[in-house]
Amino acid sequence: MATHFIVGCGAVARNNEGKFLMVKQMGGYWRGQWIFPGGKLELGETLEYCARREFIEETGCDLTIKKEIGAYVSYDPNTDFEKQVVLVYFLGNGLSGTPKVGEGVTDVAWFHMKDIEDMAKKGQVPGLILKVASDSIQ
């Protein structure tokens, strides 16, 4: 049973074609899967600042945080990751820069919602991330 919690924040960005910017996680909880840029909240940070900082670190791009999409809880007792993760995702806009592989990721790419749904069926996108994508367009 998880006895520790981690708070993380992430940012969701979409381009004019409706595609989502995603990163392929190098390690950690979702190693090898496509997710939205994000990471751990550091002491003294606001949730919005954390989401933006992680987005910049992982994609090399900046964005403006527009609104909160939602808060989500993730825990899988079948992994060796013995922490419950509380994640807060934000919708961003005004993307500046060209996406590139940044800290802790092995790839960065744009995907349509249909692509994300298909990748989730193949285990390449966590179910929680599929829900965040869906919630962001509601």
Task: Annotate each language-model stretch with its function.
Residues M1-F20:
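Conserved N-terminal beta-strand and adjoining loop/helix that marks the start
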Residues T3-F5, Q33, D80-V86, V105:
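A generic structural micro-feature
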Residues C9-A11, E68, F90:
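A structural signal for short, well-ordered beta-strand segments
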Residues A13-R14, M22, G92-G94, W110:
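Conserved hydrophobic "DFG−1" position in protein kinase catalytic cores
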Residues N15, V73-T98:
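Active-site-adjacent beta-strand/loop module that shapes the phosphate/pyrophosphate-binding cleft
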Residues K19-E57, C61:
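Conserved Nudix-box catalytic region and its N-terminal flanking loop in Nudix hydrolases
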Residues Y29, Q33, E103-Q138:
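Nudix hydrolase/Nudix homology domain
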Residues D62-G70:
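A short coil-to-beta-strand element that immediately follows conserved catalytic motifs
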